Amino acid sequence: MKSLLLAATILLSTGAFAELAYDRPVTDRIDSGAIEYFIQGKGGATPKGNAACEDGLFYNNHFVALYDGATDKSGKSYDGKKGGRVAEEIIEKVFKSLPPEASKEDVLSRINQSYQDFYTAHPDMDFVKNATWRPTATLIWYSFARRELVAIGDSKARVDGVAINKKSKLVDDLNSELRVRVIKQLKLTEADVAKNDLGRFYILPLLERQSNFQNNPKAPKAFQYWAIDGFEIPAEEILVWRFDRTPKVIELSSDGYEDYPAASNVNAYEEDFAKFLKEDPQRIKNPSTKGLQEGNVSFDDRAVLIYKAR
């Protein structure tokens, strides 16, 4: 895989975000350093798979950001797009228009306003009462002007070799363990699960109910979680890390990658991913709410964005 990835690397010289190139490593530059990224939908390297990919990323001279649209559980679509893709596109559009020194409050305010515009365009749906219908995403970004890393939800980063915000949601942990228990109790093979994941089928009502805890300060504290969905997030739930100087290396990755590799480059991420996928395609050894479905190339979309200072 390493040689193929190296051979397929795209070199850009725009110094600013352009349309995403899927399925192959991309290198680029901004004023302060080098950019490398990779993104692929779980459906694989096809136009349809790329159009459905709910992970996204953005970079320019002022920000690096990565966002992960949540897998839809409602069955709803909007102009042919699932909620996770809608969330990805809303966030990307906002980052393209941000002023260089935008504060975290400004970023979130602009995102929420874009969401409200979207909700207004769909008056037949009550997004306040039915959180399951809300296009949802996690988001993490670094502001070069403010020298701060901001995370909403369980988005993760590694900064100068130190893992940040790797803690998972309790509701996800509980549902992941229950899914695996069902699979083991029914003695399902990996082939069985790939064709018909009865473990996920069993927990799907819980996944739908889980949205009642999303951005809901009235929910039991243990089950609360916070995400981008157009509704307010308490200031104390916005995670912020500040730095005296811009880090030498910033790695942002979605949960399509299980962990951080030894090296800080796309090839290392992809090599670790391939190994993990081979060893545990149905996410049983490392429990998750979903595994590798028949016809897909991964259990989830995946994206990684790496910045290296000059």
Features from the language model and the residues they span:
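Classical Sec-dependent N-terminal signal peptides that target proteins to the secretory pathway
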Residues: M1-E19
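PP2C/PPM-type serine/threonine phosphatase catalytic domain
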Residues: E19-R310
